[in-house]
Structure formats: structure tokens, C-alpha cells
Regions:
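Surface-exposed loop/turn motifs in large extracellular/passenger domains
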Residues: 1-8, 16-38, 47-73, 82-108, ...
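Helix-turn-helix-like N-terminal two-helix hairpins of bacterial/phage DNA-binding regulators
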Residues: 44, 77-79, 113-114, 155, ...
């Protein structure tokens, strides 16, 4: 079995994928051992840094069929996915990440997701703020995926985002089989939003999914100051664990106007939701097991908990 080790020392260029301001076709990995690290502001596997003029994209997406793949993003770059960019209309992203087999470990750089969106950052040299944030489509059919977000990034989903008025979205995760373990960096959800990010959509019909949020974030759903998004479970086993003030499945801690619970529908499978516990030295009871993060009930009397729908024959 062959081995490929790539470390890109050029800012803005991915380890495997596109350079800054450039597009690439689909990336297909069938086997072997790969240890890939992206340059600063770029993904380990996926897109390089975006520019103000040109979107940077992996057209078609990243496909992994087997092998042992370890992907690490540079600062503000996802392990697998996108990098940073400075124009919301010209993003750095991939059309999707599709895993059919193998053992995949993806670690986001500072402010970025393990799998999904790159992270926001501020360049002191140019005095410009660069965005990241948005997750992508991730489909898991088999194999093992372990994803770790960088600080303020989700394990799977969105990286950190600068804007408090416009939240980043966690993208869409579809799990049909295999095993998924996702851990958010500080203030990022295990699966869903990074800091200031909403949860996106999670659909699970098979396999095993385990997700743990970083500080004040949901296991599955919103990062700190993020809404819960949509979660649909029809099969498999799902475990979501919030940290400190984050919900197990739902919203993160609220300090602005977000962190609502989102919409959760369970028609089959096994779901385990564990609320975040009290943060040492701070008075609170933590977030909901399924619902909103801590802080919403005191500040917002609207429909904060979201919805929970269960099939008629589903046993709680």
C-alpha cells in the first residue's frame, strides 16, 4: 500500500486541491495512506483561499472510497472543505464531501471546521477582515470519519464567522452508514455551526453518529450564538452532547438574538441527547437536552424551543 505525505508551505493553497483564487475538478481517493496539510488560509484537502474577484471552488467535490486519509487545514482552513475568503459572493468552498469507505481523520485549522467551512480571520498586514464559515454537503455511506474543529469551528459544518448580523450555516450532513465522530472546537458545535453559526440540516438514516460541542455549543446544532437548524433521524444511532450552556441537540448559548432550538424529527433509530452542564464559576443550569441553549428563556419569550416531532410508534 502506497503512502503520500504532502505539506503545503504556500499561503492560500490547499494540500490537495486548488490554489488561491483558482478552481479545481473533483478529487477522488481510492486507497493508500495519505497525510495532507494545507497552507495558511487553505484546506488540507479542498479549496484554497478565496479572493475578492474569483470564487475558489472544488467543482464536483471530494470523494473518498477507501484508504487511510489524514487531512489538516492551515489556519482558517478546513481539514476537508473550504478556506478563508474576503467577499461573501466569492467563497472558498467545495461542492461536497462524499465518503464511501476508509478511515478519514479531518482536523480544521484555527477558526475552521474539521469538515466543511473555513474560518474568518483579520489580516493585520492589509487591515482587512476575511470571512469563512459556511459548511457544505457531506454524505457518509460507510467507513469511519473523525472530525475535529479548530477553535471556534464545528467538527463537521461551519467555521467561525465575523458577522453577528448574518450567521454562517452548517451545511447538510447525510449519514446512511458508517461511523461519524465529530467534536467542535471551543464555541463550535460538534455537527453544525461554528461560533456565530446556525446548525444547517442533519439527516441520519443509518450508521453511528456521535457529536460533542465545544464550549457553550450544541452537540448537534448551533455554535455559540447559533440556532439549532433541522435534525431528522429515521435510523441508526445518534448521540449529541452539548458543553456548558449548549444543548445536546439544538441551540448554543445565546448572547445576541439567536440560539433557538431548531426542528428535530425522530421517526426511528436511537437518539441520545445530553445537555451541557454548568460552567465552573458561572451560575447556570446549562442548555436543553433537545431544544434551546441557555440564556434564551430569560431574554426571548417567543418560540425559543423549536419543535420536536416523534413518530406515533416511537418509544421515548
Amino acid at each position: 500500500e502506497g503512502r503520500l505525505v504532502v505539506t503545503n508551505n504556500y499561503d492560500g493553497a490547499a494540500g490537495i486541491g486548488s490554489a488561491e483564487g483558482r478552481n479545481s475538478g473533483p478529487i477522488n481517493i481510492y486507497g493508500g495512506k495519505l497525510d495532507i496539510t494545507g497552507g495558511q488560509y487553505a484546506a488540507g484537502i479542498g479549496a484554497g483561499k478565496g479572493t475578492s474577484d474569483v470564487a475558489t471552488k472544488i467543482n464536483g467535490g471530494v470523494f473518498i472510497y477507501g484508504g487511510t486519509v489524514t487531512a489538516t487545514g492551515g489556519d482558517s482552513g478546513a481539514g476537508i472543505g473550504g478556506g478563508a475568503y474576503n467577499n461573501s459572493a466569492k467563497r472558498s468552498e467545495t461542492d461536497g464531501v462524499f465518503i464511501y469507505g476508509g478511515t478519514v481523520t479531518a482536523t480544521g485549522g484555527e477558526l475552521a471546521a474539521g469538515v466543511g467551512g473555513g474560518g474568518a480571520y483579520h489580516s493585520f498586514w492589509s487591515n482587512k477582515s476575511y470571512n469563512g464559515g459556511f459548511g457544505c454537503r457531506v454524505d457518509v455511506y460507510g467507513g469511519t470519519l473523525t472530525a475535529q474543529g479548530g477553535r471556534r469551528g464545528a467538527g463537521i459544518g461551519a467555521g467561525s464567522f465575523h458577522s453577528l448580523s448574518t450567521a454562517s450555516m452548517g451545511g447538510t450532513l447525510n449519514v446512511y452508514g458508517g461511523t461519524v465522530d465529530a467534536t467542535g472546537g471551543a464555541y463550535g458545535a460538534g455537527i453544525g455551526g461554528g461560533c456565530n453559526g446556525n446548525g444547517g440540516t442533519v439527516n441520519v438514516s443509518g450508521g453511528i453518529v456521535r457529536a460533542k460541542g465545544g464550549t457553550d455549543a450544541a452537540g448537534i446544532g448551533g455554535g455559540e450564538d447559533g440556532n439549532g437548524g433541522t435534525v431528522n433521524v429515521s435510523g441508526g444511532t445518534v448521540r449529541g452532547e452539548g458543553t456548558h450552556y449548549g444543548a445536546g441537540i439544538g441551540g448554543g448559548e445565546r448572547s445576541t438574538t439567536r440560539s433557538k432550538g431548531g426542528n428535530v424529527t425522530i421517526t426511528g433509530g436511537t437518539v441520545i441527547a445530553i445537555a451541557g452542564g454548568e460552567c465552573k464559576g458561572r451560575q447556570a443550569t446549562g442548555g436543553s437536552a433537545i431544544g434551546c441553549g441557555q440564556g434564551m428563556s430569560e431574554k426571548d419569550k417567543s418560540n425559543i424551543a423549536g419543535t420536536l416531532s416523534l413518530a406515533d410508534n416511537y418509544r421515548v
